[in-house]
Amino acid sequence: MRIPVGQPWQITLRSVLLASLMFCGGCQTATKSLFTVSGPGWHIQEGQALWRPRRGMPELAGDIVMASDSAGRCYIQFAKTPMSLVCAQTTPTNWLIQFPPAGMSFAGHGRPSKRFAWLYLHAALAGEPLPKSLHFETKPDGGWRLENRRSEETLDGFVAP
Protein backbone atom coordinates (compact mmCIF):
# COMPACT_ATOMS: atom_id res chain seq x y z
CA MET A 1 0.00 0.00 0.00
CA ARG A 2 1.32 3.42 -0.93
CA ILE A 3 0.84 6.35 1.46
CA PRO A 4 0.45 9.86 0.08
CA VAL A 5 3.27 12.22 1.09
CA GLY A 6 1.10 15.04 2.43
CA GLN A 7 -0.89 13.09 5.05
CA PRO A 8 -1.05 14.83 8.46
CA TRP A 9 -0.12 11.64 10.32
CA GLN A 10 3.03 11.34 8.19
CA ILE A 11 4.13 14.85 9.09
CA THR A 12 3.55 14.02 12.76
CA LEU A 13 5.56 10.79 12.39
CA ARG A 14 8.47 12.68 10.83
CA SER A 15 8.37 15.23 13.65
CA VAL A 16 8.42 12.47 16.28
CA LEU A 17 11.33 10.73 14.53
CA LEU A 18 13.28 13.96 14.29
CA ALA A 19 12.68 14.74 17.97
CA SER A 20 13.76 11.20 18.90
CA LEU A 21 17.01 11.59 16.98
CA MET A 22 17.72 14.90 18.67
CA PHE A 23 17.17 13.50 22.17
CA CYS A 24 18.86 10.15 21.55
CA GLY A 25 21.84 11.65 19.71
CA GLY A 26 23.55 12.62 22.94
CA CYS A 27 24.77 16.18 23.13
CA GLN A 28 27.33 17.26 25.69
CA THR A 29 27.87 20.79 26.87
CA ALA A 30 31.47 21.93 26.51
CA THR A 31 33.51 21.55 29.68
CA LYS A 32 33.88 24.87 31.47
CA SER A 33 36.87 23.89 33.58
CA LEU A 34 38.89 20.81 34.47
CA PHE A 35 39.72 22.15 37.93
CA THR A 36 39.59 25.25 40.10
CA VAL A 37 42.77 27.16 40.84
CA SER A 38 42.35 27.79 44.54
CA GLY A 39 43.84 26.73 47.82
CA PRO A 40 47.44 26.24 48.90
CA GLY A 41 50.14 24.69 46.74
CA TRP A 42 49.68 26.70 43.55
CA HIS A 43 52.69 28.42 41.96
CA ILE A 44 51.55 31.56 40.11
CA GLN A 45 53.64 33.23 37.39
CA GLU A 46 52.79 36.33 35.40
CA GLY A 47 54.28 37.76 32.24
CA GLN A 48 53.64 39.00 28.75
CA ALA A 49 53.64 37.40 25.33
CA LEU A 50 53.14 37.89 21.63
CA TRP A 51 50.95 35.19 20.08
CA ARG A 52 50.59 34.51 16.38
CA PRO A 53 47.82 31.88 16.03
CA ARG A 54 49.04 30.63 12.63
CA ARG A 55 50.96 31.54 9.52
CA GLY A 56 49.80 34.76 7.89
CA MET A 57 48.00 36.13 10.94
CA PRO A 58 49.14 39.17 12.92
CA GLU A 59 50.69 38.85 16.37
CA LEU A 60 48.54 39.63 19.40
CA ALA A 61 50.14 41.11 22.52
CA GLY A 62 48.77 40.24 25.93
CA ASP A 63 49.34 39.24 29.52
CA ILE A 64 49.94 35.68 30.71
CA VAL A 65 48.95 34.21 34.05
CA MET A 66 50.17 30.67 34.62
CA ALA A 67 49.27 28.60 37.68
CA SER A 68 50.67 25.12 38.34
CA ASP A 69 50.71 22.68 41.23
CA SER A 70 52.66 19.61 42.32
CA ALA A 71 49.88 17.28 41.06
CA GLY A 72 50.77 18.20 37.46
CA ARG A 73 47.86 20.53 36.85
CA CYS A 74 48.43 23.77 34.95
CA TYR A 75 46.20 26.69 34.03
CA ILE A 76 47.29 29.35 31.52
CA GLN A 77 45.32 32.45 30.65
CA PHE A 78 46.35 34.81 27.85
CA ALA A 79 44.40 38.05 27.99
CA LYS A 80 44.25 41.47 26.45
CA THR A 81 42.47 43.61 29.03
CA PRO A 82 39.55 43.32 29.55
CA MET A 83 39.09 40.08 27.60
CA SER A 84 40.55 36.59 27.90
CA LEU A 85 41.79 35.37 24.50
CA VAL A 86 42.96 31.87 25.45
CA CYS A 87 42.47 29.65 28.52
CA ALA A 88 44.42 26.38 28.56
CA GLN A 89 44.26 23.68 31.23
CA THR A 90 46.26 20.47 31.46
CA THR A 91 46.31 17.63 33.96
CA PRO A 92 48.24 14.36 33.76
CA THR A 93 45.15 12.77 32.14
CA ASN A 94 43.10 15.55 30.46
CA TRP A 95 43.41 18.82 28.60
CA LEU A 96 41.14 21.71 27.67
CA ILE A 97 41.71 24.84 25.61
CA GLN A 98 39.17 27.62 25.17
CA PHE A 99 39.04 30.62 22.86
CA PRO A 100 36.32 32.78 24.50
CA PRO A 101 36.09 35.48 21.79
CA ALA A 102 35.32 32.80 19.19
CA GLY A 103 33.16 30.72 21.54
CA MET A 104 35.29 27.65 20.76
CA SER A 105 36.78 25.00 23.00
CA PHE A 106 38.61 21.72 22.47
CA ALA A 107 39.20 18.99 25.05
CA GLY A 108 40.65 15.53 25.23
CA HIS A 109 42.20 12.76 27.30
CA GLY A 110 45.85 11.77 27.50
CA ARG A 111 48.59 13.88 25.96
CA PRO A 112 47.44 17.31 24.83
CA SER A 113 46.77 18.01 21.18
CA LYS A 114 49.92 19.02 19.28
CA ARG A 115 47.77 21.53 17.41
CA PHE A 116 47.93 24.12 20.23
CA ALA A 117 51.27 25.40 21.53
CA TRP A 118 49.54 26.86 24.61
CA LEU A 119 48.97 23.32 25.92
CA TYR A 120 52.74 22.73 25.99
CA LEU A 121 54.01 26.08 27.31
CA HIS A 122 54.33 24.96 30.93
CA ALA A 123 56.07 21.73 29.91
CA ALA A 124 58.46 23.69 27.67
CA LEU A 125 59.32 26.14 30.45
CA ALA A 126 59.90 23.19 32.81
CA GLY A 127 62.37 21.61 30.35
CA GLU A 128 60.17 18.60 29.62
CA PRO A 129 60.35 16.82 26.23
CA LEU A 130 58.02 18.23 23.57
CA PRO A 131 56.45 16.68 20.46
CA LYS A 132 58.70 16.93 17.39
CA SER A 133 56.39 19.48 15.77
CA LEU A 134 57.10 21.95 18.61
CA HIS A 135 60.34 23.88 19.06
CA PHE A 136 61.26 25.77 22.23
CA GLU A 137 64.18 28.09 22.81
CA THR A 138 65.24 30.46 25.55
CA LYS A 139 66.56 33.89 24.65
CA PRO A 140 69.56 35.72 26.15
CA ASP A 141 67.25 38.42 27.58
CA GLY A 142 65.41 35.82 29.71
CA GLY A 143 62.51 35.46 27.30
CA TRP A 144 61.46 32.37 25.36
CA ARG A 145 59.90 31.30 22.08
CA LEU A 146 57.63 28.30 21.47
CA GLU A 147 56.80 27.48 17.87
CA ASN A 148 54.57 24.92 16.21
CA ARG A 149 56.51 24.12 13.04
CA ARG A 150 53.44 22.78 11.22
CA SER A 151 50.99 25.62 11.75
CA GLU A 152 53.65 28.26 12.43
CA GLU A 153 51.81 29.26 15.59
CA THR A 154 54.29 31.15 17.78
CA LEU A 155 54.44 32.31 21.38
CA ASP A 156 57.18 34.80 22.28
CA GLY A 157 57.30 36.04 25.83
CA PHE A 158 58.53 35.95 29.36
CA VAL A 159 57.11 35.02 32.75
CA ALA A 160 58.41 36.01 36.16
CA PRO A 161 59.81 33.05 38.14
What residue spans do the PLM features occupy?
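Secreted/luminal cysteine- and crosslink-motif detector
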Residues: Q10, G25-Q28, A88
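Acidic/charged, solvent-exposed loop-and-adjacent secondary-structure segments enriched in E/D, K/R, S/T
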Residues: I97-A126
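Gly/Pro-enriched, hydrophobic low-complexity segments
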Residues: Q77, A123-P161
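Beta-strand-dominated lipid-handling architectures at cellular/organellar boundaries
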Residues: E59-L60, A67-G72, Q89, N94-L96, ...
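Bacterial N-terminal signal peptides that target proteins for export
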Residues: I3-V16
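A mature extracytoplasmic/lumenal domain signature
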Residues: F78-P82, T90-N94, F99-G103, G110, ...
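Post-signal-peptide N-terminal segment of Sec-exported extracytoplasmic proteins
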Residues: W42-L85, H135-F136, W144-R145
